[in-house]
Amino acid sequence: MRNGRTLLRWAGVLAATAIIGVGGFWSQGTTKALPEGPGEKRADLIEIGAMERFGKLDLPKVAFRHDQHTTAVTGMGKDCAACHKSKDGKMSLKFMRLDDNSAAELKEIYHANCIGCHTDLAKAGKKTGPQDGECRSCHNPKPSAASSWKEIGFDKSLHYRHVASKAIKPVGDPQKNCGACHHVYDEASKKLVWGKNKEDSCRACHGEKPVDKRPALDTAAHTACISCHMDVAKTKAETGPVNCAGCHAPEAQAKFKVVREVPRLDRGQPDAALILPVPGKDAPREMKGTMKPVAFDHKAHEAKANDCRTCHHVRIDTCTACHTVNGTADSKFVQLEKAMHQPDSMRSCVGCHNTRVQQPTCAGCHGFIKPTKSDAQCGVCHVAAPGFDAKQVEAGALLNLKAEQRSQVAASMLSARPQPKGTFDLNDIPEKVVIGSIAKEYQPSEFPHRKIVKTLIAGIGEDKLAATFHIEKGTLCQGCHHNSPASLTPPKCASCHGKPFDADRGDRPGLKAAYHQQCMGCHDRMKIEKPANTACVDCHKERAK
């Protein structure tokens, strides 16, 4: 049994090292899934195209079934040395070599070792893979299997499970194990060390390709994760996957344990942050100090986001470190205004908020309201900082504050935000509204007005985002009573929508179309199944003939 566990651990190492062989298996050194195609779906298909670095390939790349080979090698009682060489006690991630010297040598390494192993197994009467002369069995432009590989993300649930794991020993702090994964390069000691409260995304240092001695992201991630999983397995503690499918198969990911209520991950981050427009050094004078700051409730947004990269897409740093008023090369010249207000980007404030109003509880109203711009809308987020006048802000007084001081200013701004006033007294809201001004073939419709208002209020609940923007008592009413001032007694629909459609006023539907468009559209967006759009008599009974 002990030998069986040992072989399993070696199988995991084989899985890790083959996957991360930058320049060994992938010509581009990435963990891209192979193109979709017919046949068996596998998460372990790896594209071998290392020869591509020396020029155009003569034959198609090889679709290598890694988990299948891992199982076979383990079954023969072999370990990683069957495919990987070592130097100074460290195993190379390249296949049967330490360096890439020439195209001819690389070709010989693959053919001699892969085909050689297959041939030896065939001589022993065992099931094996393609042999000499069966080139297209491996170099097949249409492999028999198709990739089901799915990228794995390190969301806050998975992150917390690692933070809370007693199997991952603390490094540098008896109470925290952050240093087991997070590190920075210390120039003085020439070592990787943990930077407390400076933990960053892996992508902050590790990109798609290796740079100097810094490995690419896929190499760094697989090396760290799989080796840690193997070390933990040696202690007989619960550990993570050690093969391709364990992480990258969709069915495996669907079974991951999910922590629903994740405690806040502590990185020394502020509860509240002050977002200031930072002009670039070369910004024109008129671009400086022209916008009021935004108090950002960082703690509340942490609870809503799935991971830090939801907002911090590369480095965990302030937005304005890259996105200045006039843009920087690091931000690909995406200016601060675009970074915060781009309506179709999930990484901008406005873009993320737009997805929230598309949820069924909000879409009934917001799906019908056309986006507009006004100074009043800007003023919901952009407000004056208490204790600082416009001249002080323009002179850079807020920018010159220490981080802790800016956080305090932001907190005071958040606490001073106007509280939502809810809606009008429910006793003043009609319980039912009889809609019968155009009743003809059908009887008037009894509209459960107060019930619908209560449903909308319940849908908002304690939502802070809704509370921030639904300030006035009549805000909620304007989902239906649109294009008129918020009021307890808004104009009737017929005030704007004529009973017959007026072609000369083609900017608005007639009354019948307005009712049906508003009611049916709301039901569709809120996914209300009954009454169905075709069930006329569910809303207004048919008149007796």
UniProtKB/Swiss-Prot annotation:
Heme c 6 binds at H162, C225, C228, H229. Heme c 14 binds at H482, C493, C496, H497. Heme c 4 binds at H159, C178, C181, H182. InterPro entries: Cyt_c_III (IPR002322), Cyt_c_III_dom (IPR020942), Cyt_cc3 (IPR011346), HmcA (IPR054813), Multihaem_cyt_sf (IPR036280), Multiheme_Cytochr_ET (IPR051829). Heme c 10 binds at H301, C349, C352, H353. Heme c 12 binds at H341, C378, C381, H382. Heme c 1 binds at H66, C80, C83, H84. Heme c 8 binds at H298, C308, C311, H312. SUPFAM superfamilies: Multiheme cytochromes. PROSITE patterns: MULTIHEME_CYTC. It is found in: Periplasm. The keyword Acyltransferase does not apply. Heme c 3 binds at H111, C135, C138, H139. It comes from the Bacteria. Pfam families: Cytochrom_CIII. The keyword Heme applies. Heme c 7 binds at H222, C244, C247, H248. Heme c 9 binds at H313, C319, C322, H323. HMWC (high-molecular-weight cytochrome c), ORF2, ORF3, ORF4, ORF5 and ORF6 in the HMC operon form a transmembrane protein complex that allows electron flow from the periplasmic hydrogenase to the cytoplasmic enzymes that catalyze reduction of sulfates. This is High-molecular-weight cytochrome c. It comes from Nitratidesulfovibrio vulgaris (strain ATCC 29579 / DSM 644 / CCUG 34227 / NCIMB 8303 / VKM B-1760 / Hildenborough) (Desulfovibrio vulgaris). The lineage of its organism: Bacteria, Pseudomonadati, Thermodesulfobacteriota, Desulfovibrionia, Desulfovibrionales.
